[in-house]
């Protein structure tokens, strides 16, 4: 099996798993998986596709400038430049971006803080943090309509081979050294977002909570 086909199948599997969670509302979201380092190439989801379906045109191969390697009628996802920034600056192998109701709520509620902070949850161990009552933070950036501007702002928060950024009312982007790690971190963040949204609702309803 060629490296290209292997990577295609791997990304298709991730897409299917996230689609099963219904995380691709109205064709939103984008995914990518690095294929080669030198030169940099990666597979990225094609723009405007229903990601709940599996087709032969789900992905296209992209270069270090965010351009298709071969002539194609397909267009790469709108936020492909964000993926480029991650691959240029780190050794990450996979980037995942999804819009969910919970991550949009969290990005809106904590927008003025420029970050959301979570602590005391067992799921934080998914990030490799094992301290008791550990804390994790995720930056929140403004949602710029101009993608190069958005990519420049996003790039300020890329500081390792794994990471995550919330874009206000525009979903979460997570990256990891491989698809398994990126998906694991995405699932952990979404768990924390869902937990916090429900916690805020209970607090508003004046339901006693145990800290």
UniProtKB/Swiss-Prot annotation:
Catalytic activity of the protein: 5-(methylsulfanyl)-D-ribulose 1-phosphate = 5-methylsulfanyl-2,3-dioxopentyl phosphate + H2O
Cofactor(s) the protein requires to work: Zn(2+)
Biological processes per GO annotation: L-methionine salvage from methylthioadenosine
InterPro entries for the chain: Aldolase_II/adducin_N, Aldolase_II/adducin_N_sf, MethylthioRu-1-P_deHdtase_MtnB
Family recorded in the similarity comment: Belongs to the aldolase class II family. MtnB subfamily.
Source superkingdom: Bacteria
Assembly and binders: Homotetramer.
Cofactor note: Binds 1 zinc ion per subunit.
Keywords: Amino-acid biosynthesis, Lyase, Metal-binding, Methionine biosynthesis, Zinc
Annotated Gene Ontology cellular component terms: cytoplasm
EC number: 4.2.1.109
SUPFAM superfamilies with a match to the protein in the record: AraD/HMP-PK domain-like (SSF53639)
Xref: PANTHER family: METHYLTHIORIBULOSE-1-PHOSPHATE DEHYDRATASE
Keyword Amino-acid biosynthesis: yes
Cross-referenced Gene3D superfamilies: Class II aldolase/adducin N-terminal domain (3.40.225.10)
Gene symbol of the encoding locus: mtnB
GO molecular function: methylthioribulose 1-phosphate dehydratase activity; zinc ion binding
Protein name per its UniProtKB record: Methylthioribulose-1-phosphate dehydratase
Coiled coil region boundaries: none
Binding annotation for Zn(2+): 97, 99
The organism's taxonomic lineage, starting at the top: Bacteria, Bacillati, Bacillota, Bacilli, Bacillales
